[in-house]
Amino acid sequence: MEMASVFTLNVRLDNIAIITIDVPGEKMNTLKAEFASQVRAIIKQLRENKELRGVVFVSAKPDNFIAGADINMIGNCKTAQEAEALARQGQQLMAEIHALPIPVIAAIHGACLGGGLELALACHGRVCTDDPKTVLGLPEVQLGLLPGSGGTQRLPRLIGVSTALEMILTGKQLRAKQALKLGLVDDVVPHSILLEVAVELAKKDRPSSRPLPVRERILAGPLGRALLFKMVGKKTEHKTQGNYPATERILEVVETGLAQGTSSGYDAEARAFGELAMTPQSQALRSIFFASTEVKKDPGSDAPPAPLNSVGILGGGLMGGGIAYVTACKAGLPVRIKDINPQGINHALKYSWDQLEGKVRRRHLKASERDKQLALISGTTDYRGFAHRDLIIEAVFENLELKQQMVAEVEQNCAAHTIFASNTSSLPIGDIAAHATRPEQVIGLHFFSPVEKMPLVEIIPHAGTSAQTIATTVKLAKKQGKTPIVVRDKAGFYVNRILAPYINEAIRMLTEGERVEHIDAALVKFGFPVGPIQLLDEVGIDTGTKIIPVLEAAYGERFSAPANVVSSILNDDRKGRKNGRGFYLYGQKGRKSKKQVDPAIYPLIGAQGQGRLSAPQVAERCVMLMLNEAVRCVDEQVIRSVRDGDIGAVFGIGFPPFLGGPFRYIDSLGAGEVVAIMQRLATQYGSRFTPCERLVEMGARGESFWKTTATDLQ
């Protein structure tokens, strides 16, 4: 069967060729290897038509140019040589586009990422729209790869090596105005005249490359280059802790191209692409990408969601303010905040103002757009304006009676169809719904702090929650820009349940004499964004530890914290960063110096602060308890799948993405090896390390959680 055409060529009366990109039946344009023959056929036609004056590439999709290459192609490669051949094919096609004797212009609207930007870089000029949907970037590093179709060679020559390195090493996406300022595009125009401007550019001679800033020219020379790569290498190593091989290869490949010429650069790029595609880190990162894409498509239940036209929020504190912001400014829904104090409402409104004003200052948002978004948020100290709200999110104190009272008030003051969603982190949803007249419309909706940054939400139905309530809440979470996982109504839900033993073990090692900074550094080296002690300071020691007694009551002594340690810290009025007193010292605002541990913490908890464990030993103790608890959560159906478990850990607590999540990590070690490590730790440190039955059985049978080590889902 012949493949439907993705690239369509039309020649205008003025002899400008328009190549329209439109992958049939797909929302996004992505590049696949099988499109190569189509592109070559079009290039042949372009070369044969001697009347042509220029060429314009444009997308038929309403919100994307090309979103990148199809990642499934990489998963289908069995060897580094196969993946390298893919890169070489991409490089060759881009070279053929660039070698056309007439001007070739990319007319960009919407996402222009990865292979899409590499195609645009192969063109002689680029014009893009000023639409917020228009972003340009090379995000391959986030999949453990590097740009494989010439991006590592063309970008540094176009915008300068230091700017290009920042883009490629971080996967950073640029808005239109930023891209223009850096010289990545030649013009930024309204969408309505994009094609017209691109055509006019194609009629001129090839756009001459803009001279690079003096700084970039110095850094491109041998001395400047040596200094730059040394500095960037050091900074990158500090950031990645050596856990992401792609960053090292990016530096190596870009430097090769600059020092030895583009031919050597392209060779190095293709070779590195092939080798990186086979690394466990890239396989794990691609698995996270596929899993998160699947989760975002998951409706949560079979029932159709109810309409969502407006939302109410109870409580204007830190969480309430954050939830109001994502509901109004991301989901675009009108929000009404109720707080018993006018100050609470002001706090919540200021929260959104601060977020939006920051965007205005960075020129990511117009002041008029800020005002429009803020106008969606209103406040009240009673239930006026709540009568027709479709969903109410409760974000009040963690007190069961108070939350039950909120349910009663909402049922009394809101419509019969209104859903009550509690942002509790520790109280059973079934208990919150115990006295409800419409328990089927009560559900848990657990956000993580800070709300605007943390991508995960846990959606917690109790036994009586209806399928439609689940579907509607999932729909809201997605509108808010969140990745939702549906979890069972058991103590701690999923994320806090696997996090608690990890934090507890860190505190226990403190009491044994390990130093705060050693414990934190060990877990950062392992791959977490921050260490467990610093995390406790950031979240709030009072907030972070209040769930421990709840978990201990539900699951027994494996959740008990070291005796009196937490109470000693809290009794000394240490709540962490929020009150400037925690495990670390907090000086003046704005100081970026390295965090210092408060030496008073050691006598306070009766410890010496003289460690004996190596960094891997520290990490092993914390992580093994987390893995064991994650397996219990699968066994007890707290999570619906290992996919949700991996996504929940990576997006909810920063489990190292390059390991793919707890279940991928267990598979990579082997369940038998995990059991052996835990049995050794149980002998050394006690029964809390006893591996759970499911893990022991899987180890004995040589089973894994994922059916395959490839990136496809089960």
UniProtKB/Swiss-Prot annotation:
InterPro entries: 3-OHacyl-CoA_DH_CS, 3-OHacyl-CoA_DH_NAD-bd, 3HC_DH_C, 6-PGluconate_DH-like_C_sf, ClpP/crotonase-like_dom_sf, Enoyl-CoA_hydra/iso, FA_oxidation_alpha_subunit, FadJ. The keyword Glycosyltransferase does not apply. It is found in: Cytoplasm. One of its GO terms (cellular component) is cytoplasm. One of its GO terms (molecular function) is 3-hydroxybutyryl-CoA epimerase activity. It catalyses: a (3S)-3-hydroxyacyl-CoA = a (2E)-enoyl-CoA + H2O; a 4-saturated-(3S)-3-hydroxyacyl-CoA = a (3E)-enoyl-CoA + H2O; a (3S)-3-hydroxyacyl-CoA + NAD(+) = a 3-oxoacyl-CoA + NADH + H(+); (3S)-3-hydroxybutanoyl-CoA = (3R)-3-hydroxybutanoyl-CoA. Residues 1-190 are annotated as: Enoyl-CoA hydratase. Pfam families: 3HCDH, 3HCDH_N, ECH_1. Gene3D superfamilies: 1.10.1040.50, 2-enoyl-CoA Hydratase, Chain A, domain 1, NAD(P)-binding Rossmann-like Domain. Pathway: Lipid metabolism; fatty acid beta-oxidation. Residues 306-714 are annotated as: 3-hydroxyacyl-CoA dehydrogenase. The keyword Lyase applies. Keywords: Cytoplasm, Fatty acid metabolism, Isomerase, Lipid degradation, Lipid metabolism, Lyase, Multifunctional enzyme, NAD, Oxidoreductase. GO terms for biological process: fatty acid beta-oxidation. The record marks E118, E140 as: Important for catalytic activity. Its EC number is 4.2.1.17, 5.1.2.3, 1.1.1.35. In the N-terminal section; belongs to the enoyl-CoA hydratase/isomerase family. Catalyzes the formation of a hydroxyacyl-CoA by addition of water on enoyl-CoA. Also exhibits 3-hydroxyacyl-CoA epimerase and 3-hydroxyacyl-CoA dehydrogenase activities. PANTHER family: TRIFUNCTIONAL ENZYME SUBUNIT ALPHA, TRIFUNCTIONAL ENZYME SUBUNIT ALPHA, MITOCHONDRIAL. Heterotetramer of two alpha chains (FadJ) and two beta chains (FadI). This is Fatty acid oxidation complex subunit alpha. It comes from Escherichia coli O139:H28 (strain E24377A / ETEC).
